[in-house]
Amino acid sequence: MKMKVLNVGLVKGRHNLPVEFYVYNEIKDVLDFDALLLGAIKFFKEHSNNNQIEYNLYITGLTPATIAVIRAFSLTANEGDRLTFYHYDREADSFKKQYGFVVGFDSKFNFTYLI
């Protein structure tokens, strides 16, 4: 089975990004951590289809939103799902890849995250 790839921006309208989807259309209060987490969980549940998905997340700042996405991924991901981060490099005018997480199970079926 081929892994589905979703290019995802953190917040719509903040930057011009090479993405099809955004986790958040808007953020009313960047310090409302519960709302951020619920919004990110909603995003992952809407895009999960029990197939392996690689989420390429383009980070645009807003650390609380990024942390909420990581937490939501850890709560909703299916086995084989991946979360990879892309950060903008001003000098190169391109995005730099940072490997994140792959969800899997060990031989005793214990849930694990591989970095």
Segments predicted by a language model, with ranges:
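Acidic, metal-coordinating catalytic cores used for nucleic-acid/nucleotide bond scission
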Residues: 59-67
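Long, low-complexity, Lys/Arg-enriched
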Residues: 1-56, 68-115
